[in-house]
Each structure stands twice: as C-alpha cells, then as structure tokens.
Amino acid sequence: MALAARLWRFLPFRRGAAPGSLLSAGTSGSRGHCGPCRLRGFEVMGNPGTFKRGLLLSALSYLGFETYQVISQAAVVHATAKVEEILEQADYLCESGETEKLYQLLTQYKESEDAELLWRLARASRDVAQLSRTSEEEKKLLVYEALEYAKRALEKNESSFAAHKWYAICLSDVGDYEGIKAKIANAYIIKEHFEKAIELNPKDATSIHLMGIWCYTFAEMPWYQRRIAKMLFATPPSSTYEKALSYFHRAEQVDPNFYSKNLLLLGKTYLKLHNKKLAAFWLMKAKDYPAHTEEDKQIQTEAAQLLTSFSEKN
C-alpha cells in the first residue's frame, strides 16, 4: 500500500478531480491572459493523453524497478543462506574425519566466488591427496588443484586469515613437485602468508604452529640446500630451533593439545636443543594422543620410536 501511495503521486490527476481539471484551471481568467499560459503548457506536455500514458508507464517502470530490487535482495539472502548451510555441512564432515565425502560435497561448488568455501575446498583437496590410498598421479593433480582453489580464495578475500594460511600450505606442497630451488624460492612468500594469517587471527593455533614448522625447517636445512639458498637470495631464509620452539609453545598456549604434530615437534625440537627431559615429556604426550586420523597414527608411531631410541641410549 505504501508503494501504491507513492506511485499515485506520479499520475496526472488525483481521486476526486476530473480528468480535465489540470487543464481547465487555466480558463478561470480572461481568455487573452490565459491563452499563452495554456499554450506553453501544451508545448511542454504535448498531447494530454500521451502525457498521461507516459507518466503511467514511468510509474509502472518505477514499480518494476522496486520489485526487481526486492527480488534481487531476496536472491542474495537465499544464496547467502545456502552458502552458510554448505559451510556448516563441510565443517561437520571435516570434524567427523569424512575426508572424501567432504571433498565430494565441496567440488560441486568449485566455481563459487565465496572465499570461505574456496579455502575449505583447497583444504579438502589437500587432505584427499594425503590419503594413503590416493595414487601418486592423483596426489599431484590434487596438490595443484588445492593451490588453485587457495589462490582464488585469497583473490576473493585478502582479509581471510584462512585463505592466507591455506595458500601458504598449498604453495609449500607444490614445491615437492617443482624441486628444491622452487621450494626455497617460495620460502619468503610462504612465511609472509603465515605471518599475515597470524596477524589477522592471533588465536589460530594452526597458523602459529605452521610458522613454527617454517622455522624448524630452515633451522635444520642441510648444507647443500643452504648453498642453493645463497644462490637465490642475497639474504637466504634462515631460522633457529629456539624460534621454532617459541611458536610451538605459543600454539599450545592458544589451544592446548589441539594437534598431535605440535606435541611431536615440541619433543623433536627439545631433542635438537639437547633437553632430553622436556623432549621425553612432549614425546610421551604425542604418543598418548587419541588417534582420529591417519596422521595421528603415524605421529603416535614416530613418537614411540623416538622414545624407544631415547631410552636405549640412556
């Protein structure tokens, strides 16, 4: 009704007035005085019937535009609601360890423009690539596919900490297929995106953990890789075990026991720093961590082997 009331103002006459009253008002004075006024009016409006139809069409166009806006807004709301529903399903499948079902769900929306959906698809592609039953050929395809999804997520939303995190992870994975030079060349880019992810969300333990892995990797870099790094950079990437340790501890402070690998790497870093007591403490925690994924099982095995080796040497 409010819309109808607004439209009524555009019509050439109102209720209670005769259709010709707009023109007849000009005849109330002397004919010689009003004639020119009426002529000027006709020169502007043209034929009265045409003018009325024009105004009516304008009013209908206005009504059509408002209807279009309402429908468009409703479509956006519906699309947003659908994306939210997909994300809820995806997060449930991820938490349940349903790796392949999650990938199948999200690949249906691989042309999406939504950054939240795209980085989840990058993660799902990578997770399927890491399954033991995935062939080497399929794994390579999935790794590159994951990088493309992560890149698109970042392009859609540079303020998404998760997009930065998964772009860095996927870029690192691609280095496994492009050689040590490419891996080292991408090192600073990877670090930059991990640091940006932490800046955007200081409470994300995974981003902090990954920054720790970056430090650990360059702290233990073998001599021949250091030579390659010096050829690629004036100041090659480097780090220390102490820096790695600080990130692993920081991740635990943010979210205790969030990830079995963080526990394992705390133990391994303490071994590198020759602190056997604390190394044993964290390796034991890694060994006793409940195994929910294949990776958890592998970490349990590695922690147990390190503890056995550790005890035999003592």
From Swiss-Prot:
Q: What is its main location?
A: cytoplasm
TPR repeat segments run 168-204, 222-258
Q: What GO CC terms are in its UniProt record?
A: mitochondrion; mitotic spindle pole; spindle microtubule
Q: Which InterPro entries match?
A: RMD1-3_a_helical_rpt (IPR049039), TPR-like_helical_dom_sf (IPR011990)
State the compartments where it is located: Cytoplasm; Cytoplasm, Cytoskeleton, Spindle; Cytoplasm, Cytoskeleton, Spindle pole
According to the UniProt record, list the residues that bear N6-succinyllysine: K165
| Keywords recorded for this protein, A-Z | Cytoplasm, Cytoskeleton, Microtubule, Repeat, TPR repeat
Which GO terms label this protein's molecular function in UniProt? microtubule binding
Which family does the entry's similarity section mention?
A: Belongs to the RMDN family.
**Subunit composition?**
Interacts with microtubules.
Q: Which PANTHER family does this one have?
A: REGULATOR OF MICROTUBULE DYNAMICS PROTEIN (PTHR16056), REGULATOR OF MICROTUBULE DYNAMICS PROTEIN 1 (PTHR16056:SF16)
Q: Which protein are we looking at? A: Regulator of microtubule dynamics protein 1
